[in-house]
Amino acid sequence: MSFDPNMQKLYIQDVTLRDGMHAIRHQYGLDHVQAIARALDRAKVDAIEVAHGDGLQGSSFNYGFGAYTDWDWIGAVAEVLEHSVLTTLLLPGIGTVHDLKHAYEMGVRSVRIATHCTEADVSKQHIEAARNLGMDVSGFLMMSHMIDPEALAEQALLMESYGAHCVYVTDSGGAMNMDEYAARCQAYDRVLKPETQRGVHAHHNLSLGVANSIVAVQNGVVRVDASLAGMGAGAGNAPLEVFIAAADRMGWNHGCDLFALMDAAEDLVRPLQDRPVRVDRETLTLGYAGVYSSFLRHAEKASSDYGVDTRSILAEVGRRKMVGGQEDMIVDIALDMVKAR
């Protein structure tokens, strides 16, 4: 896809209020989401994603219960937005078309339909439903590092055929390097229509979130996911204020107020972190072992409950190639390790 960020504007998608839910076990207060959304809106971010960390209706025993419902959070944010597009995330099998319609009624105008990178076919019903509602819709291929670029591109092609306006290379494990990201973006170019946008969703587990986002843009990506102070699963997403600063220095057209984003990250988001969102021995293990970033807090709880090193649990998760939705197996792994002592 031909895209020149010096001439054409990037689409900046904030995920602080969705992926960032993972970092605090989905416990944002309504005053928190309003304050953060208001700051992002004033900083002229293009879109703000709001939902439980695992998407609409993710609040459950398996994923963790939210402090509020998706509708509470979405309603609170809808009240304060004047510029940014209200967006949400839906995983087929967790959220339903009924939920999608309700989100639309509440003011959501853009949705990302997320599947594991080999399961694009389960997104068909939901992408088509979103298009029928008149929504902007993206396909979101999670754990994109787990299959080769050509196979990923074939999955992206399916999402495009269902009606997706954009398809993401989603590095849920923060496990990819710059060459691997570039290869996947280039594979998309070989099969997708020029008018279908590409997106990047990077995690920072190997400290490459910003670097991978930059390389993705250099390879034709238009939509960039990022979060204030990196607020997200694992070591977090590409930090929004850092990406914007880097983009600014490169002369890219992003339309955001850098200092306002810095202030929001420092004053509103960082104080909410009950566990620092950073690269440390546990989050580094996620990227090193290629593990779904949202498994971090689940593995840390299992470690505390059963006295097993978090890193050992995560390494075994990676060895078994577990994917999102298998959170309950983390306890099984911890119990197996206790039994093997």
UniProtKB/Swiss-Prot annotation:
One Gene Ontology MF term: manganese ion binding
Domain of life of the source: Bacteria
Domain annotation Pyruvate carboxyltransferase: ranges: 10-262
Catalytic activity: (S)-4-hydroxy-2-oxopentanoate = acetaldehyde + pyruvate
Key word Membrane present: no
Binding site for Mn(2+): D19, H201, H203
CDD domains attached to this UniProt entry: DRE_TIM_HOA
Protein's UniProt keywords contain Manganese: yes
Residues carrying the site annotation Transition state stabilizer: R18
GO aspect biological process, one term: catabolic process
Active site: H22 (proton acceptor)
Enzyme Commission code(s) on record: 4.1.3.39
Key words, A-Z: Aromatic hydrocarbons catabolism, Lyase, Manganese, Metal-binding, Plasmid
Residues the entry annotates as binding substrate: R18, D19, S172, H201, Y292
Bilayer-spanning residue ranges: none
Matching NCBIfam families: 4OH_2_O_val_ald, PRK08195.1
Family: Belongs to the 4-hydroxy-2-oxovalerate aldolase family.
Protein name: 4-hydroxy-2-oxovalerate aldolase 3
Organism: Rhizorhabdus wittichii (strain DSM 6014 / CCUG 31198 / JCM 15750 / NBRC 105917 / EY 4224 / RW1)
